[in-house]
Structures are given as C-alpha cells and as structure tokens.
C-alpha cells in the first residue's frame, strides 16, 4: 500500500474514532487537511512549516507595519508578497522582515506602492481566483492541489511544484480567464513532480 494511502486510511480511522467521541469539529478540520495533504507534493513537514511561515509573517506585519494591505502566501518555503504599501522603502522593509524568518528560502516581493485597494477590488480578485480554480478543475490536466492561485488587482499569481506541461497548462488557463490582466508564475519546476 502506498505510504500516502496508508496515512489516509489511518487518519480516517482516527477521525471516525473522534467522531464517535463527540469531537466532530476537530475531526472535520483534520479530515479536510489530510485530504489536501495526501494530494500535495510538499512533505507534511513543509506543508506545516508553510502555515507557520504565514503566521509568523502576519505577526511581524501587525507588529511593525500599520495600515498596509499585505498578503503573505508560502508554498514550499517560498513566500509571495502581494498587496499595497505606501512607499518603496516600506516595500523593501517588509521584504527584508519576511526574508529573515528562519525557514524561508525565497521571497517574491510583488507589493505595489500606492493606496490600499477598495473592498470591491478585493472581492473581484476573489471572484477571479475562484474562476481560475474552476477552470483548473474542469480542465483536468493536473490536480488543483498542485497549483495555488493568488489574485491581486487582476494579476493572477501561480505557485506550486509542477512539471513544465502542468505549468504551461495552468498559465494558459489563468491567462484566458475573464478579469485576469496578467499572470505571474512563481512555480518550482520538477519533472519528478509528474510522478507524484
């Protein structure tokens, strides 16, 4: 039995046991995370560390920088920064602060200098992200769990561990999605990825 499948079976048995003990919310959350992790190309440790990086980064942003709209997305220890800041200096300072987190390998700083976007623009970005992901699912050429989509001001950022073919397919689908003005690839390419 494949290690991932064995993990899923053991996890589901544990979750059922918790359900029988009345711990439904905890079990439901755990089941969702386990299903995502089984199809993820990152190791469980890296998956968890990506979550930790995002929490640490948010903490640093709240502590040091006020009134900024910064999104922090970590995938395989590579961090993407999107949003708006009031100055080029603050953009650099935020990038440096995130780079100093111990486990971060690389920071792609796509922060733009200017005023914060309006709520309607952010809602539109969420809608675009949903449309891109829906097109990924309908296309079926790769798992939606292999490509993370972040949209900011109409720009779709694509992250993941992918083969060249998967990256090209994801880029083309995102590029031709209504509302997307630009696509930025933040992929890690691995031919071995197609075997997982």
Model-based region annotation:
Residues 2-7, 22-196:
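N-terminal targeting leaders
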Residues 10-22:
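Bacterial N-terminal signal peptides
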């Amino acid at each position: 039995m494949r290690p991932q499948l064995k993990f899923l079976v053991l996890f589901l048995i544990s979750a059922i046991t918790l359900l029988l003990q009345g711990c439904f919310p905890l079990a439901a959350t755990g089941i969702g995370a386990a299903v995502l992790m089984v199809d993820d190309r990152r190791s469980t440790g890296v998956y968890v560390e990506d979550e930790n990086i995002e929490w640490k980064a948010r903490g640093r942003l709240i502590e040091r920088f006020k009134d900024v709209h910064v999104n922090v997305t970590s995938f395989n220890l590579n961090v993407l920064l999107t949003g708006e800041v009031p100055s080029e200096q603050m953009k650099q300072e935020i990038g440096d602060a995130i780079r100093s987190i111990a486990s971060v390998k690389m920071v792609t700083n796509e922060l733009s200098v200017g005023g914060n976007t309006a709520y309607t623009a952010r809602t539109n970005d969420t809608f675009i992200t949903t449309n891109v992901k829906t097109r990924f699912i309908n296309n079926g050429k790769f798992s939606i769990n292999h490509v993370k989509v972040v949209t900011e001001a109409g720009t779709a950022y694509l992250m993941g561990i992918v083969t060249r073919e998967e990256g090209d397919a994801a880029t083309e689908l995102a590029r031709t999605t209504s509302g997307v003005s630009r696509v930025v690839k933040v992929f890690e390419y691995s031919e071995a990825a197609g075997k997982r």
